[in-house]
Amino acid sequence: MSVKIRLKRMGAKKRPYYRVVVMNSTSPRDGRAIEELGYYHPVEKQNQIKIKEDRMKDWISKGAILSDTVKMLLNKNNLNAKSQEV
């Protein structure tokens, strides 16, 4: 079982927000998550992204793979994304 850290779409039509979650890589996009690590609001102007960095580091150390979108969001928001290479 491969585990990924990726986005789960929530919200209303034309007003999306996303939860940053840990999921089995074969689960559907909006399927059941193992753990929720934070959120991302692309429509909001302030406080767009919040992530529990300690939990993310823990999952990465256990072998979870970051999706390309999550990597891009971490780099764009200057969050501690250098632990991706573990």
Swiss-Prot record:
One cellular component term from this protein's GO annotations in UniProt: cytoplasm
Record's keyword terms, sorted: Ribonucleoprotein, Ribosomal protein
Keyword Ligase: no
A single GO molecular function term of this UniProt record: structural constituent of ribosome
Family annotation (SUPFAM superfamilies): Ribosomal protein S16
Biological process annotations from GO: translation
Keyword RNA-binding: no
Disulfide bonds: none
Domain of life, source organism: Bacteria
Family, as annotated: Belongs to the bacterial ribosomal protein bS16 family.
Protein name per Swiss-Prot or TrEMBL: Small ribosomal subunit protein bS16
